[in-house]
Each structure stands twice: as C-alpha cells, then as structure tokens.
C-alpha cells in the first residue's frame, strides 16, 4: 500500500505490505482479508486465485481493520462462507460489521482446535496481546507453515530478498509489540514445539531457512528486553538549543571515553519510532 504513515503515526517511506493467503484443498481457506483501501484489488486477486472455486472458510486471525476491513463484504459475497475466529473476535465483530447478517456462519476456535481442509490441517494457537487481545495464529501441519498474524512483520512494502529484514522489522516490533515481551515469549515457547518450514506474517515477506531462524532469534532477544548491540542513546528535547548543545557535547565526551556507538536523537524532530527502537536496542540511555 502506497502510504507515508502506518497507523497515522509511523513513517513508512517504502509503503506497507498487507498479506492475505489462500489454501486450495478439498476445502478452501482464506487467511485474513486486507486494508479497506485495497478492497477492489484484494477482491480481484481472490477471485483470480480461486479460479472459479468458492471459499469455504475465512480465517480471521486479527480484528485490526487493516486485516479485517473486507470481512463483511466477503461474507456477503459468499453466502456459504464460514468465518473462523476466536471468541474474543466475535465480541468485536459487531462493532465493525452487521453481525446479524452472518452470525450463524461463525465457527469459534480456541487453542488446540484443528480444522481439516483435506491434505492440509489448520491448528490454532492463542496469541493474545501480540498485539491485540483476540489474536490467534495458525499452524498448517502438512507444509509446516506458521501464519503469524502481526508477528514477524515489518514496515515497508515487499522488496527484494537482499533487503535487511531486521532493520524495519526491529522498528516495527518495538513500536507495535515492544511492551508485550511476556506475551511474545509465550508464543515463542509454543512455536518451539512445532516443526516450521516457513513463517507467513500479515506484513512483510515470507520467512524461510536462515532468514526465519534469524528472525526467531531476534524475536527471542527483543522480547526478553536484552540489548541487541553495544551503544548509547542520547535523547533530548531543547526549547532554546542549549540542551541540544549539552547533548551533543555529552556524545563527544562519551566517544572520547571509548564509546563505540553513540546515537543522538532530537525528540522534537527525529522519527519517534526510530528513537524507541534505539532505546530498546542499546543497553544505555
């Protein structure tokens, strides 16, 4: 999506990707919808992917509007479609859609429930507060894929494979999920019991192989609130410029004393999301 701000607050010069997945089997499952601003494109892509078939299940892992906005119209378009979601999601649906129009076509799932599609089977994992209370993740056991909702996401639209995933994933994590370290640790413990070939997040690229292993390592590190690398963040706000001079002087003194990495951030002008990222990344503030 070609936007300059994500959630009207995070600067995203490279835009933002919103992912939705389709599993074609004896039964057809659609994994989440997308942002309402991409309704026409998403619907056209879905129709093309279905190639004449009718979806049986729409899995709602996360009720945040950038992933659920098209649920109502999709349920209307496919009268036999069943919406699969957590009980918490059911409580929220009525605030966004005419729930009465498809209330009888809702399947509530919880931790440990499974949904066979044919060759593929969906296994549901409760992931509350990563980063909304109703979130579920889904493990597909045939191809060993973890559909991770907003977990393992990143800022930016889909780019080439040489891009540094960690750079914008780090800024995304600490601003979106940073205060939910305990909840992320709980999900990682559940994931550690699974054989995973790929992680499919709702934002950013699919992760496999070494990239996936590194992403899991970083999520474990970040969610334990351990510094990722050595460094010092000097953050300041300065009305008349004197505190700014002091902050920059302090940075120079720290470098003279042997500090290998000193980052100086103006809280009034610099990207706040990057400042928060650095506050978590470095051991000294």
Q: Each predicted region: which residue ranges?
A:
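Short amphipathic alpha-helix with an adjacent loop that forms part of the alpha/beta core around
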Residues: 47, 114-117, 273-280
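Conserved beta-strand elements of the Class I
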Residues: 22, 29-30, 123, 139, ...
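Zn-dependent metallo-beta-lactamase
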Residues: 1-27
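Active-site neighborhood of phospho(di)ester-bond hydrolases with catalytic His/Asp-centered motifs
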Residues: 31-33, 55-63, 83-86, 146-150, ...
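N-terminal beta1-alpha1-beta2 submodule of the flavodoxin-like/Rossmannoid cofactor-binding fold
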Residues: 211-285
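Active-site metal-binding motif and surrounding structural segment of the metallo-beta-lactamase
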Residues: 26, 37-84
């Amino acid at each position: 999506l070609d936007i300059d701000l994500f959630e009207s607050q995070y600067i995203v010069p490279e835009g933002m990707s919103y992912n939705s997945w389709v599993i074609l089997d004896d039964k057809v499952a659609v994994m989440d919808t997308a942002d309402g601003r991409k309704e026409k494109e998403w619907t056209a892509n879905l129709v093309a992917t279905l190639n004449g078939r009718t979806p049986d299940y729409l899995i709602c892992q996360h009720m945040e509007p950038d992933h659920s906005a098209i649920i109502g119209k999709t349920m209307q378009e496919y009268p036999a479609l069943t919406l699969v979601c957590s009980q918490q999601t059911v409580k929220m649906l009525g605030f966004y859609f005419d729930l009465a129009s498809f209330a009888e076509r809702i399947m509530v799932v919880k931790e440990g429930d499974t949904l066979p599609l044919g060759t593929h089977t969906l296994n549901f994992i409760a992931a509350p507060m990563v980063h909304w209370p109703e979130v579920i993740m889904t493990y597909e056991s045939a191809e060993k894929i973890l559909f991770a909702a907003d977990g393992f996401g990143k800022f930016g639209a889909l780019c080439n494979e040489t891009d540094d995933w960690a750079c914008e994933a780090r800024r995304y994590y600490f601003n979106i999920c940073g205060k939910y370290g305990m909840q992320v640790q709980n999900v990682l413990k559940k994931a550690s019991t699974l054989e995973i070939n790929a992680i499919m997040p709702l934002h950013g690229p699919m992760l496999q192989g070494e990239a996936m292993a590194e992403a899991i390592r970083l999520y474990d590190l970040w969610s334990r609130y351990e510094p990722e690398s050595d460094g010092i963040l000097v953050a300041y706000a300065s009305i008349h410029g004197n505190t700014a001079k002091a902050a920059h002087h302090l940075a120079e003194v720290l470098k003279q004393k042997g500090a290998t990495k000193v980052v100086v951030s103006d809280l009034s002008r610099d990207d706040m999301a990057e400042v928060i990222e650095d506050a978590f990344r470095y051991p000294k503030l």
